[in-house]
Amino acid sequence: MSEEMKLVKPSVEYLDSYLGCLRRGVDLIRYRESETPLTNEIEEISNDVTKFFKQTFNMTGGGEPVKMDDGTFVERLPSITWWLWDGEFCGRIQFRWQHNTVELPPYCLGHIGYGVVPWKRNKGYAKKAL
């Protein structure tokens, strides 16, 4: 099933493969596998798929706050997300920014965040995505 890895805009066409990773228990924020499916995320997407896709290309920021690991909520930054695809979902890369400055808030680790699912690592996908 493998084809050359490319970046694709998140869309319904690729959603089943993305959801398959969640069902498999892959935490797509930390890119670790867990013992159980990530049912909260699956349910959120199922409840409002339009909202899910809107958040992947959020040029203005705002919208619902982002819940941090410590339970606090922070402002959603403008961001663009691309999925890594080689015939199936293999990861994602996200670009974040604040308007009118190069600075990011202290809770944001950088302008670029990316990850590759565990079974697709060591193929150069992250390097190619960058």
Regions found by a protein language model. Give the residues of each.
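GNAT-family acyltransferases
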Residues: 1-111, 118
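Conserved acetyl-CoA-binding loop-helix of GNAT-fold acetyltransferases
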Residues: 113-116, 122-130
